[in-house]
């Protein structure tokens, strides 16, 4: 495990163009009182491009520290004050189909069926109806919802709604998937199931994922690498490599290797005096 104070090249494979590279990112906004608030300050991080296996990186930090702000900038939903965001070496200048985002809140269209929700992005791209239906059903099958293709969102549980959101994102085959605390509103049992589902589905798709959470256990269970952020304004304080890559299941959370990394993060966060704002785990 490594923990540099600044991570300008952390996670890059030697000689390869990183999937994501952020250089000296600064983001501010004006609050309701008219005061300028610095949300992100000099963030540098790199997520490797690992063809054939994918990569899952986690932004871990206290609530309100700027994690979601960074994600929105990568997605192109907001413009940074300064700095550079590169996807596969190309600068981000706005939204695009190369990035897909899954939010914590449920974002399905209530009047469309589950299948029609998943088809929505393909419909905007002008994909023929028969092909849209085929692809949507394939991804619904992957997330275990093929039998609910003709249901409406109001008939689904919270976990099922998030599965719809995941299928709707992946069917567009983005180069990078951005996930903003997608399981934060779920009960513990559903949350565990969704964590396992994410690992299974995303590995099959060879996706690069940037996942935001303030749950330490979730971060260690999901991540190949973890970027620890400070209080607002967000800075990258440490980067942790998670040394195991296979057989990630609920039993792993009781293993010595898992507990060692979890405790290491707890000690780190305690030393930064942010533990009170970070969830220890479920």
Stretch-by-stretch model annotation:
Residues 36, 95, 115, 149-152:
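Signature (C-motif/LSGGQ) region and adjacent switch/coupling loops
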Residues 75:
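Helix-to-loop junction immediately C-terminal to a conserved catalytic motif
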Residues 83-94:
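Conserved ABC transporter NBD signature motif
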Residues 112-120:
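Short coil-to-helix segment of the ABC ATPase nucleotide-binding domain corresponding to the Q-loop/switch region
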Residues 119, 123, 130-148, 200:
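Conserved ABC ATPase "signature" region
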Residues 151-154, 172:
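Conserved signature/switch motifs of ABC ATPase nucleotide-binding domains
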Residues 166:
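Hydrophobic anchor residue at the start of the ABC signature
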Residues 177-180:
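Catalytic Walker B motif of ABC-type/P-loop ATPase nucleotide-binding domains
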């Amino acid at each position: 495990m490594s923990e540099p104070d600044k991570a300008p090249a952390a996670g890059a494979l030697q000689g390869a163009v990183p999937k994501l590279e952020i250089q000296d990112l600064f983001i501010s906004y004006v609050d309701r009182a008219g005061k300028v608030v610095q949300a992100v300050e000099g963030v540098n991080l790199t997520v490797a491009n690992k063809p054939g296996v994918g990569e899952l990186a986690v932004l871990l930090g206290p609530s309100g520290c700027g994690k979601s702000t960074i994600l929105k900038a990568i997605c192109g939903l907001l413009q940074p004050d300064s700095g550079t965001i590169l996807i596969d070496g190309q600068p981000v200048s706005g939204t695009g189909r190369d990035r897909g985002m899954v939010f914590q809140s449920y974002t399905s269209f209530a009047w469309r069926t589950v299948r029609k929700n998943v088809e929505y992005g393909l419909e905007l791209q002008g994909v023929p109806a028969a092909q849209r239906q085929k692809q949507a059903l394939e991804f619904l099958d992957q997330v275990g919802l093929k039998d609910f293709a003709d249901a409406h969102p109001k008939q689904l549980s919270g976990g099922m709604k998030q599965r719809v959101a995941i299928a709707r994102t992946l069917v567009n085959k983005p180069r990078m998937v951005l996930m903003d605390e997608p399981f934060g509103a779920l009960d513990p049992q559903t949350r565990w199931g969704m964590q396992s589902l994410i690992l299974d589905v995303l590995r099959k798709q060879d996706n690069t994922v940037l996942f935001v959470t303030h749950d330490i256990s979730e971060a260690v269970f999901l991540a190949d690498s973890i970027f620890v952020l400070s209080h607002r304004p967000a800075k990258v304080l440490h980067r942790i490599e998670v040394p195991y890559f296979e057989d990630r299941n609920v039993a792993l959370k009781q293993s010595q290797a898992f507990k060692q990394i979890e405790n290491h993060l707890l000690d780190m966060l305690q030393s930064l005096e942010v533990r009170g704002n970070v969830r220890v785990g479920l």
